[in-house]
Amino acid sequence: MPSKFSLSLVAKKNTRDTDGSDPRKPKVPRVHDLTATPELCPVEPPPEVVAKLGEQNLAVGIDIETADWTEKKHALHKGQFGFHTMCGPEVFDQRIIQIGWFVKDLSNPDADNEHDELIIQPDGFEIAVKATKLHGVSNERAQQDGMPLKTALDIFMRVMERLEQRSARLVIHHLEFDAGIIDRELTTAGLDHYRQRWQSMARAGFCTMDPTIGKWIQRCCGRTFDVHENSTAVMSLERTINLLSPSLPVCEAVQNFRRNRLHTAGSDAQLHCLIYKTLREMATNGLDLAAQSKLARP
């Protein structure tokens, strides 16, 4: 791939340090620090980034919302699908109450984007208050507007089978979490015959929390970016959006995020596709993030 150039942000040398750090070394600013000055430098994606981004033109963003979540974190490791995670086995006992998908044809901006979002009725479990505050689905709403788990996952997997035939690629923020819970829920719903196909699609998917991608974003933007340093994947998604927001198109999902910070499955699935599209453009077109609004927070 030919070299591309973009403006990245490099911090000015600090000559008045009082914290004991070496003032001769430039500091890399945090995401919220907008005091850096632009400097032209080459940012060519390394081969491992190019390989991870892939060449598929059809992406399907996937997201789930759960009835609760655990705050426990483990050492960073690779999960069952080969992606990095800090989740332990207890995470995969979480119950899905909303699942959404958004299909994006990267080669045709005028193509209709197939999308849907399904609410699942709780069966023997309650939705935690903290979860409702995150995604807006209460126990009452889920019982009224939801459908049985088996019905929802059967609809979902039929769509996935059709998209797989079109060589669509899964794009998920924290793939091990979402894909692992979906895999477990397929068994819970008595739909084990879908698991092999789902696992195959997940292994070939793209995780927007990949540390290699995070390091490359840091090079492009001149800002520290550790996707796994946040307490939850939701915070990591918000940080990713903050970094890429000047480049993300104005759409309902982005407006919803900026307006009320609700993380519904359908909106987050669309955001996953937009992040993937932006990263692909950064790699192929040398998209200049730093020149656009100085990475202003949304």
Set out the residue ranges of the language-model regions.
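Entry/capping segment at the start of metal-dependent catalytic domains
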Residues: K4-K12, G20-D112
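Metal-dependent phosphoesterase signature
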Residues: L134-F156
